[in-house]
From Swiss-Prot:
Family from the record: Belongs to the protein kinase superfamily. Tyr protein kinase family.
GO cellular component: plasma membrane
Keywords of this entry: ATP-binding, Glycoprotein, Membrane, Nucleotide-binding, Transmembrane, Transmembrane helix
Extracellular side: 1-20
Example of a GO biological process term: response to wounding
Tissue expression from the record: Expressed in the epidermis of larvae and adults and in vulval and rectal cells.
Any GO MF annotation of the entry: protein kinase activity
Subcellular location: Membrane
Bilayer topology term: Single-pass membrane protein
UniProt lineage: Eukaryota, Metazoa, Ecdysozoa, Nematoda, Chromadorea
Side Cytoplasmic, residues: 42-396
Organism listed in the record: Caenorhabditis elegans
Entry protein name: Protein nipi-4
Function: Pseudokinase which plays a role in resistance to fungal infection by promoting expression of antimicrobial peptides (nlp-29, nlp-31, nlp-34, cnc-1, cnc-2 and cnc-4) in the epidermis. In addition, up-regulates nlp-29 expression upon physical wounding and in response to phorbol ester PMA treatment.
Membrane-spanning intervals of the chain: 21-41
Length: 396
């Protein structure tokens, strides 16, 4: 006789009741899983925005050092505002107009206008921008812009964003363009040579300070960005304005730049066989000589519409392709010529003798007559190509 092992109906009903999940329990369980998924995504989302780990790995140690050394400048990304207005572009990234909000109760009423630099989404460019920020944080001079803040996301999302000091007068290049070259003769404010020498003296003081500093390898620091668009003015009145040298960075990297920047490069860099030649203090002196010429002409473009080969040919000329402005005194032009001489013959900024650039500018500022004025020199080109629409040889 076979035994019936089928459980009674009451036992079956009890087992089904034990394994059955009520609608409330289902909602609670699904909500818990949903919250866990959100928590995991929020925790990992910043890492998902980073470049591939194999591209970051070679820089990981240096990145940790940079974060430690820049800790006094780190602020929340919400405290840095970026406007739509783009000021310019460098080898490392873009520069926008922006601001920094202090950590106070009335923070939105105490906004500090700044220039915000954002790196390109390339690992090497990001590291280079952070290196520039570290270098600038160690410098303190009244004629150098200051580093104000570094976003904390610079070391998490790994696209650095730094805030730099910005002056209300804008750049010296903008002053020349909008206050001088685009104005009629009757609307232009007269510019004394004496006032321009004061501006040149302030820039030379900043370069003298930079060249007196040493890097981690014991070498003199250099600037490598001595252009009018990198000089900020406190107000649009050159008679009483102060200037600061900005955009401190590494040396110009070979021929990766456009022709307007190549026009400032010395022969030993432009004609060098190396792709990234070393930048030395005497290279800054050459660039400062071109900068003086640019100021004496009130914003004329050096080597206007010349190709790289044409610029190299200009180096063989006595004036290096930069003709002396008509109203420039001989003593001032002698300084320009000395800066554009052979590397071993160029004067220095950090020299303690009276032959230094700073000392000579100070002396010139005292002896130059206030009756000497500067006039805008038009850009002159021998180009007649259709590409540039060159129907005239004079361009303001």
């Amino acid at each position: 006789m076979e035994l019936d092992h089928t459980p009674p109906p009451s036992v079956l009903n009890d087992n089904c009741s034990a394994s059955y999940m009520t609608p409330y329990a289902t909602v609670i369980a699904m909500s818990g899983l949903y919250l866990l998924a959100i928590f995991y995504f929020c925790k990992k989302s910043k890492k998902m925005c980073q470049p591939m780990s194999d591209s970051i790995y070679p820089y990981q140690k240096r990145l940790t050092q940079l974060e430690r050394e820049l800790k006094n400048y780190l602020i929340d990304e919400e405290s840095i505002e970026v406007d739509d207005f783009q000021i310019g572009q460098t080898a490392d990234g873009f520069i926008f107009r922006g601001g920094v909000f202090p950590k106070t109760r009335n923070r939105f009423n105490a906004k500090v206008t700044t220039a915000v630099k954002i790196s390109f989404p390339i690992v090497s460019k990001s590291i280079s921008l952070l290196e520039d920020a570290l270098r600038l944080s160690k410098l303190d001079h009244p004629n150098l812009i200051r580093l104000l803040a570094v976003s904390q996301l610079s070391f998490t999302v790994f696209r650095p964003m730094i805030a730099l000091e910005w002056l209300p007068g804008g750049t010296l290049a903008d002053y020349f363009q909008f206050k001088v070259r685009e104005k009629d003769d009757s609307e232009r404010s007269p510019i004394q040579l004496k006032d321009m020498l004061s501006i040149l003296y302030q820039v030379s003081q900043a370069l003298k300070y930079i060249h007196s500093q040493l890097d981690e390898f014991g070498q003199e620091l250099t600037h490598g960005r001595i252009f009018t668009r990198n000089v900020l003015v406190t107000e649009p009145d050159l008679r009483k304005c102060e200037v600061k040298l900005g955009d401190f960075g590494d040396a110009p990297m070979g021929l990766e730049y456009s022709t307007p920047i190549i026009a400032y490069m010395p022969p030993e860099i432009l004609c060098c066989a190396e792709r990234i030649p070393p930048h030395r203090p005497e290279n800054d002196v050459w660039m400062f000589g071109v900068f003086i010429w640019e100021c004496l002409t009130l914003g004329a473009q050096p080597h206007f519409r010349k190709s790289v080969e044409e610029i190299k040919k200009s180096f063989r000329l006595p004036d290096r392709g930069l003709s002396c402005p008509p109203t420039c005194p001989l003593d001032v032009w002698t300084l320009v010529s000395d800066c554009l001489s052979e590397p071993h013959m160029r004067p220095r900024f950090a020299s303690t003798t009276n032959a230094s650039i700073t000392s000579r500018l100070s002396e010139l500022h005292h002896i130059v007559s206030p009756a000497l004025f500067l006039y805008a020199i038009p850009n002159q080109s021998v180009c007649t190509c259709i590409e540039h629409h060159c129907q005239s040889v004079i361009h303001y």
